């Protein structure tokens, strides 16, 4: 069986595919539809992108609120509010922020706007491909790392010590960890795929593979949006509780 972890990158989508027999593959896809076309028969595709969006209203997705509570400072800040669905179809940041403000009472951060197109891609895929809803599920890398390590990461993933911290967590779970960045670097430049993109996609793939018998989720009972998409973040490892 194939287990796929995916993270957005400057070149599109960076995917790590792992097999139970030890085989692995890394690849960049220009769009999520191409990724789905290749990996639609995978056991699971775990992706770092909001799935399931509110149409409006002042209440945030429960998974976002609970993920921040679980991570605690400073990692809680890595979980930003998901936009409402109408905002992701806007033609500009100003328009998107105005729509989000009108529909939810909150403006839109530039960070969220920078991935709006990717959120839209995944939303459209899941709304048009019912089979994808069974396999494509949302993760947040920091939740996955916390679940494996038993604590939130202490250092930023943008710093060398943070990348080392996360690599060590992955190595404790998956012996093939060192080979994945090597494979990625032999095929893609840093300006196409950043090192933290590689680690985030890898922790998603490892989560899918190790959690093949079942994954935990935040919240424990998933919410569904108005279109029937789950609003949750899945993980594998220790039971997740509030940050200490």
Placement of each model-derived feature along the sequence:
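RNase H-like (RuvC/DEDD) metal-dependent nuclease/polynucleotide-processing core
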Residues: 1-3, 8-244
């Amino acid at each position: 069986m194939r287990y796929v972890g995916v993270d957005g990158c400057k070149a599109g989508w960076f995917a790590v595919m792992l097999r139970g027999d030890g085989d692995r593959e890394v690849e960049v896809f220009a769009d999520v539809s191409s990724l789905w076309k290749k990996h639609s028969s995978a056991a699971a595709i775990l992706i770092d992108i909001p799935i399931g969006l509110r149409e409006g209203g002042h209440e945030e997705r429960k998974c976002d609120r609970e993920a921040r509570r679980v991570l605690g400072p400073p990692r809680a800040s890595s979980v930003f509010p998901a936009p409402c669905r109408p905002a992701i179809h806007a033609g500009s940041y100003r328009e998107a922020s105005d729509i989000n403000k009108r529909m939810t009472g909150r403006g839109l951060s530039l960070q969220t706007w920078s991935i709006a197109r990717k959120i839209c891609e995944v939303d459209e895929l899941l709304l048009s491909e019912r089979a994808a809803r069974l396999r494509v599920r949302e993760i947040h890398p920091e939740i996955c790392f916390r679940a494996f390590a038993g604590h939130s990461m202490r250092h930023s993933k943008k710093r060398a010590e943070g990348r080392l911290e996360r690599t060590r967590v992955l190595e404790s779970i998956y012996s093939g960890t060192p080979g994945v960045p090597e494979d990625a670097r032999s095929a893609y430049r840093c300006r196409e795929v950043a090192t933290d993109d590689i680690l985030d996609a890898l922790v998603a793939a490892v989560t899918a593979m190790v959690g093949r018998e079942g994954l935990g989720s935040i919240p424990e009972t998933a919410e569904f949006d108005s279109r029937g998409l789950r609003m949750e973040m899945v993980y594998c490892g220790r039971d997740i509780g509030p940050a200490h």
